[in-house]
């Protein structure tokens, strides 16, 4: 679920081994989730479960903090705002210039938050600084690498092959 900085981003530090990147994911008022907090341990985390257990809902919540489109239908309680927050350990990586370029406070832990109000307004924050979705996508695109069930089928797609070669 969490990817390798070197292969996914220009924000790299090849001398540092990959460490635990996502520390915590908090989800409030999203789909069937009233409130959920997941603290990720060191090492590999695999989320499994039967059909209907909520794995895709968890990925949908993660998608919100990655800048994906928000949908009012995903509110658990339509009278309250939805909040998804991820805390990432970025201490091993040289990403301070990205924060400076975007006028965001830098810390060794990066807090990424997305809020969706019942009126449909969506707001994104990095370390409590409001950011637009492009900045959010750029940052989280470096922090998160999702691999889904049928991703291996892309290898047969010519445009995917060309992107990998280029």
Where is each model-derived feature located?
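Gly/Lys-enriched N-terminal cap/neck module of very large, oligomeric protein machines
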Residues: 24-164
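Arg/Gly-rich low-complexity intrinsically disordered repeat tracts
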Residues: 1-19
């Amino acid at each position: 679920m969490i990817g390798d900085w070197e292969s996914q981003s220009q924000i790299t530090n090849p001398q540092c081994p990959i460490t635990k990147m996502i520390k915590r994911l908090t989800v409030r008022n999203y789909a069937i989730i009233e409130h959920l907090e997941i603290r990720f341990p060191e090492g590999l985390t695999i989320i499994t479960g039967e059909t209907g257990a909520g794995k895709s809902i968890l990925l949908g919540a993660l998608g919100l903090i990655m800048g994906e489109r928000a949908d009012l239908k995903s509110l658990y309680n339509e009278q309250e705002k939805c909040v998804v927050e991820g805390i990432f350990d970025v201490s091993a990586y040289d990403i301070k210039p990205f924060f400076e370029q975007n006028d965001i406070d830098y810390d060794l832990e990066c807090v990424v938050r997305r809020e969706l109000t019942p009126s449909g307004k969506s707001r994104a924050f990095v370390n409590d600084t409001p950011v637009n979705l492009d900045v959010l996508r750029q940052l989280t695109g470096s922090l998160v690498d999702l691999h889904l069930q049928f991703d291996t089928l892309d290898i047969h797609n010519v445009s995917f092959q060309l992107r990998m070669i280029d």
